[in-house]
Regions:
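N-terminal module-boundary/linker segments of secreted carbohydrate-active enzymes
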Residues: 1-42, 46
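Domain-level detector of nuclease and nuclease-like folds
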Residues: 36-246
Length: 246
């Protein structure tokens, strides 16, 4: 009997699907006004647009004993890195070298005026989400760090600027129905099913898409949708400059 839906310490590079995760930063930063990310939000791109959360290797459960995703993976070969040492649940970042963002990666994505993280990934630029995403998910991708984050952006940024993202921006401070969001985001992925995550107050926090690993073609997202049943009255898009930290 499975005790968790994930496989800790799975072999890196063994999976069948990707999940592209976008987040709405105002929902993540509410109640965290002392954090650097929240202090950067007012008037920013992320205050009114979706941000990049991550790109997650996912299993076809039938091929992995019912498990849904790998995490904190182990790289094959002599001397291969074991990212289970990075899991906060088991001590967290015991091996700082492999668990953190490399200087070259910071330079490529965050350290120059052309870096994309301050605009599109504020939790990466001003928080510790980049290190978390690399250790938990990137370690399972079969890629090294810079190519992994380049793929994250290649898959996620077109969705940020797509039909669904435009709908979110247009409804800041108001509501959108689940059907409206599903149709708008579905139009960006050939009509495939998209999943959403909402707070207990029905504020939109995440949007998840699924891709076939081999072809990168959109497929139906099997991740649970926490908005569809509880938010029949509408899904709220938080206006940070009105309802955020002041």
């Amino acid at each position: 009997m499975l005790t968790t839906p994930w496989q800790e310490g799975a072999p890196s590079g063994v999976f069948e699907q990707w999940v592209v995760a976008l987040e709405f930063q105002p929902a993540w930063s509410q109640g965290k006004c002392d954090e650097a990310v929240a202090q950067q939000l007012s008037g920013s791109f992320a205050a009114t647009h979706l941000s990049v959360h991550g790109l997650w290797p996912n299993f076809e459960p039938a091929q992995h004993g019912g498990r849904h995703w790998p995490q904190y993976c182990v790289v094959a070969g002599s001397g291969g890195d074991n990212y289970t040492s990075c899991d906060p649940a088991t001590g967290g970042r015991a091996n700082g070298t492999i668990c953190e963002i490399e200087p070259a990666t910071w330079a490529a994505f965050n350290g120059t005026s052309s870096g994309t993280w301050p605009t599109h990934n504020p939790e990466y630029a001003f928080g510790d989400l980049a290190a978390h995403e690399w250790a938990k998910h990137g370690s399972c991708s079969g890629l090294t760090q810079e190519p992994y984050f380049a793929l994250v952006e290649a898959r996620a940024l077109p969705l940020v600027s797509g039909t669904g993202g435009a709908l979110v921006t247009s409804r800041v401070g108001g509501n959108a129905s689940h059907a409206e969001l599903a149709a708008a985001f579905g139009a960006d992925v050939s009509g495939k099913k998209v999943s959403f995550s909402c707070s207990d107050e029905c504020a939109l926090s995440d949007v998840w898409f699924a891709l076939d690993r081999a072809t990168l073609a959109p497929i139906d997202c099997a991740d649970p949708d926490s908005c569809v049943d509880k938010c029949a009255g509408g899904i709220h898009i938080i206006d940070w400059d009105k309802d955020g930290c002041h």
